[in-house]
Amino acid sequence: MTKSIIAAIMTMNLTATVAFAQTDVHCHMIPESYMESLKAHGMEMDEGFPIPAWSAGEHLKFMDEAGIQTSVLTMPAPQPYFGDGNESAGICRRFNEEAAALKSLHPGRFLFCAALPLPDVDKAIQEARYALEVLGADGVKLASNSCGQYLGDPELDPMMEYLNSRKAVIITHPHKPSAVNGQLVSAVPLASYEYLAETTRAILNMVAHDVLVRYPDLKVVVPHCGSFLPNALPRFKGLLPVMTAQGYMKAVDVEKNISRLYFDLAGTATDDVLESLLTITEPSHILYGSDYPYVAAPALAGARKSLESRLALHGLDPNDIFTDNAARLFGAGIPVREYGDRIVRLAEIDVDPDKLDEYLCFAKEVGMVSMKTEPGVIGLFSMQDKETPSKVYILEVYADRQAYEAHIKTVHFRKYKVGTADMVKSLRLIDTIPLLSSSLNKTAVR
């Protein structure tokens, strides 16, 4: 094997499996206190579909099974404003304090972006200050609109000014728009298409008001694979010169606004969607999001595996998407993975051709069990030489020496070693040095 082939294998395989270190930036905390508030006003179905059951225990169980280290919690839709600003402020305060308590109870597992009682801007600023400066919130969550007040509305500028002073992360999420007529937004569930339109509407309104240029230290996370923005932004940019020349709009810096946006992959991140998203952003601004608990855990498991297998095809490093981009965005809230202590081994094995099939079964089993049950085993991949199928290569990647030593003492490794002893004709270890993910990606993915 040449060095370039080894690098390619490590990029497409090693980065496709990150053991228990992933970050989910799109998931929801739905405490009983929030549900009680909705029920008191008959608003449980305001978004057109039932709000799922949630508990911290079930959320942690999902995270453990999915290999998610950290989840960033936000309040779901609807926005808890029922005509009384004080009541809304109280609901948001209780939510934020419960989220802060959960973060404290499970260090490193939960972060949270605070709920704000919009459309009351003064109360929203007060709650943002309390959440960020006292509770230790990791950002804020803003609805696409609150009672028709959309992101980008000049009335929100004082709040944006404060958030900018805190260099805040803003997670946005679509909410039910005001209906044009009695049937337009209720004919089909909002999540089917109107949520995508709603997000696009809100973000374009921010761009049209140059919000992220005027407040350049804000970082805004756009949900659901960018919604319709990859299609809407080219049209917006194309029409902008005409609109400004006619006096309908002020000149804005579209590219600078877009550069402040981050995009989560909650929803359906198909090949076409990924390709489209990459026309408006760069890989370092793409993040993993599950939309748990609105999407059931079993469905998420299948979707996530499918996503992992496709990312490299688009020049995307799964380590960046699932972990490192979020760590850079949220800073100290998420630990950045270290590469220096990794152990990387490449074994070249000559197998008895008559026993090859049996050997491959052993190798496949030990690889699957090891990566599923041992957090320190980052990768264990078996490959056959195309010209000489009985020549097998095994790429082994361990978090550190301790993880390697623990691995070779496991029952499943001993089963593999003893079971294949008479199948292996020779074994040669190729010494390697682990590369940083970024340089490895540049070397191999072209």
Which functions belong to the PLM regions below?
Residues 2-4, 23-25, 30-70, 97-105, ...:
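Mid-to-C-terminal alpha-helical segments outside catalytic/metal-binding sites
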Residues 7-17:
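Bacterial N-terminal signal peptides
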Residues 44-85, 109-117, 138-142:
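Divalent metal-dependent hydrolysis catalytic cores, especially in the metallo-beta-lactamase
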Residues 133-287:
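Catalytic pocket-lining loop regions of alpha/beta-barrel enzymes
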Residues 335-392, 397-414, 425-446:
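Short S/T/G/P-rich N-terminal loop/turn motif that feeds into the first structured element of a domain
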